């Protein structure tokens, strides 16, 4: 890690050289801990792409703690520490991700809701809740019709 100032020679228009202090250049490769923190926040495909950048990034991307974070990002609370030794014996968190977690994530539908879709879903939920709460009591506990089916698109031909 070189944080010292660099000195360079600059040639002026009158053919005289003059010393000039240059600003130190920041390189992410000089800061291993920063690189680990950045890679730890990537998804699986981005982490694989980052491993192809250079040898250093490839070595850092093979770090098991990065893959552990990726595997258990969605799990709360985090599994116990005794699980770490079991996973290490079976090939590590990278193998766990590629053999178990990635295929499951690939099968899940990608839900990207717009603001209108979210508001519609919440409105339908409220209507459904009040129908169950109030209408059922008025009609002698008869099950009311629900509007929840409207959340899914209907193909009318």
UniProtKB/Swiss-Prot annotation:
GO terms for cellular component: nucleus; SCF ubiquitin ligase complex. InterPro entries: F-box-like_dom_sf (IPR036047), F-box_dom (IPR001810), SNE/GID2 (IPR044184). Its main location: nucleus. GO terms for biological process: gibberellic acid mediated signaling pathway; protein ubiquitination; regulation of gibberellic acid mediated signaling pathway; regulation of shoot system development. It is found in: Nucleus. Residues 24-70 form the F-box domain. Pathway: Protein modification; protein ubiquitination. This is F-box protein SNE. It comes from Arabidopsis thaliana (Mouse-ear cress).
């Amino acid at each position: 890690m070189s944080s010292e100032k660099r000195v360079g020679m600059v040639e002026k228009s009158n053919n005289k050289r003059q010393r000039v202090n240059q600003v130190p250049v920041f390189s992410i490769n000089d800061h291993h801990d920063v690189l680990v923190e950045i890679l730890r926040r990537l998804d699986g495909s981005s982490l694989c792409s980052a491993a192809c950048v250079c040898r250093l990034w490839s070595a850092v991307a093979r770090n098991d703690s990065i893959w552990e974070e990726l595997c258990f990002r969605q799990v709360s609370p985090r599994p116990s520490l005794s699980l770490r030794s079991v996973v290490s014996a079976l090939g590590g968190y990278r193998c766990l991700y590629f053999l178990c977690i990635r295929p499951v994530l690939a099968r899940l539908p990608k839900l990207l809701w717009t603001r209108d879709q979210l508001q519609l879903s919440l409105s339908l939920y409220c209507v459904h809740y009040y129908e169950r709460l109030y209408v059922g009591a008025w009609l002698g506990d008869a099950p009311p019709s629900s509007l929840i089916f409207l959340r899914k698109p209907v193909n009318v031909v």
